[in-house]
Amino acid sequence: MKTLILLIQFFTRIPLPIQINMDEINLKKGSALLPLVGVVIGAWNWLVFSLVALVMPLPVAIIAGLFAEIIITGGFHVDALADTADGLFSSRKKERMLEIMKDSRVGANGVIAICFYFLFYGALFLSVPNIQQIGWLFFVLPIVAKGVTMLLFAKMSYAGSKEGLGSIFLGVPWWPIMIAQGIVLIVLALFFSYIGLIAYAGVLVFTIIYRLFVYKRIGGMNGDTLGAGGQMGQLVCLFCLVLIWGLM
């Protein structure tokens, strides 16, 4: 329970007034619970979307659901997406890319990435067959994001500062990663049957390609690329689901 509370405090802005000594917690092994943080975020997103959908048009409810995640996470990983875009697409050397990612200012690539991310997200949500499935997706996608993050932990080389937040998860064993994947697959199967599993196969392909690209550019992961990977992974999952539904 302490591990889950610490993970919620780490990845969300939920004000849990509980002091936990990190020396007592093995976050590397406890990272198996990371998808449960996605459950908390997803439940909040679903609740906000569902309540707004009762009184407002669907596009407004979708925007509210997307904004709900920013509220509960503090835009933690959206900021990571912007920093990653600024750094990796700066056409600079590795050291300079890492410096750009540390810069608190958002550059042109970061702004473009965020704009297209949310535009694409909204367009895909509007392409989902029915409103019930949209609600399910608001719940499930943050869980998928945490599953992708866990995959990126596998045999991770760390390119950032050893004091960086992502370095906490350097050396995560295989078994927490596999447990996390099992949780994600069960959730997808429960809500979307075999279609969800096929969509996650697409997410796995994306994760491999993304990992190879990042390692080629900066030689490993850092906190920004880990966060961005999760955000893009859930978008890829949504894209795959919409694509499969469109082909059926």
UniProtKB/Swiss-Prot annotation:
Pathway: Cofactor biosynthesis; adenosylcobalamin biosynthesis; adenosylcobalamin from cob(II)yrinate a,c-diamide: step 7/7
EC number(s) given by UniProt: 2.7.8.26
Alphabetic keyword roster: Cell membrane, Cobalamin biosynthesis, Magnesium, Membrane, Transferase, Transmembrane, Transmembrane helix
GO process terms (BP): cobalamin biosynthetic process
Compartment list: Cell membrane
GO MF annotations in UniProt: adenosylcobinamide-GDP ribazoletransferase activity; cobalamin 5'-phosphate synthase activity
Pfam families: CobS
Tagged with keyword Signal: no
GO CC entries: plasma membrane
Purpose: Joins adenosylcobinamide-GDP and alpha-ribazole to generate adenosylcobalamin (Ado-cobalamin). Also synthesizes adenosylcobalamin 5'-phosphate from adenosylcobinamide-GDP and alpha-ribazole 5'-phosphate.
NCBIfam families: cobS
Family designation: Belongs to the CobS family.
Protein name, as recorded: Adenosylcobinamide-GDP ribazoletransferase
Species this protein is from: Listeria innocua serovar 6a (strain ATCC BAA-680 / CLIP 11262)
Name of the gene encoding the protein in the UniProt record: cobS
